[in-house]
């Protein structure tokens, strides 16, 4: 869900409701006349933090860690809320994390979310793919075969 800006309602996450969840609610704004700080966007495993008037925008909600690639990586974190006093950051590449929001009307610029990733992992006792497109990274370790794309691609078994 998206974080709220000055005096606006935050957005709901996981709408419509699905299992597994598709994210959490965004945080509320500080709703102050001066020093409006937006709430952070909801992440995969936690709601976005509320903004604190004239102090700080809300952090994005935490993502979810997964070891499907062979190493623990956190995916789908929420973007930070916008502020009147700083420029937003971008989402981390290849994790699907949210980008930072912009501040009140004329301050700063909202930034892009992180690009996505597709990972397929299966036991290496099964045959390798017959073909792939899109130049995936392919690793075989720990009893698994892992195909990882950070752009368009396909796989045929």
How would you describe each model-predicted region?
Residues 1-157:
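Low-complexity, glycine/proline-biased repetitive segments and flexible coils/loops
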């Amino acid at each position: 869900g998206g974080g709220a800006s000055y005096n606006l309602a935050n957005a709901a996450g996981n709408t419509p409701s699905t299992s597994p969840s598709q994210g959490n609610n965004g945080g509320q704004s500080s709703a102050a006349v001066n020093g409006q700080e937006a709430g952070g966007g909801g992440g995969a495993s936690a709601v976005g933090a509320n903004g604190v008037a004239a102090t700080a925008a809300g952090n994005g909600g935490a993502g979810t860690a997964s070891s499907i690639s062979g190493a623990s990586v956190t995916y789908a974190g929420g973007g930070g809320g916008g502020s009147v006093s700083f420029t937003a950051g971008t989402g981390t590449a290849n994790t699907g994390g949210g980008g930072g929001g912009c501040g009140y009307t004329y301050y700063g610029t909202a930034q892009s979310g992180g690009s996505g990733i597709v990972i397929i992992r299966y036991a290496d006792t099964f045959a390798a793919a017959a073909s792939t497109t899109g130049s995936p990274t392919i690793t075989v370790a720990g009893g698994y075969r892992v195909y990882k794309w950070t752009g368009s691609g396909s796989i045929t078994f």
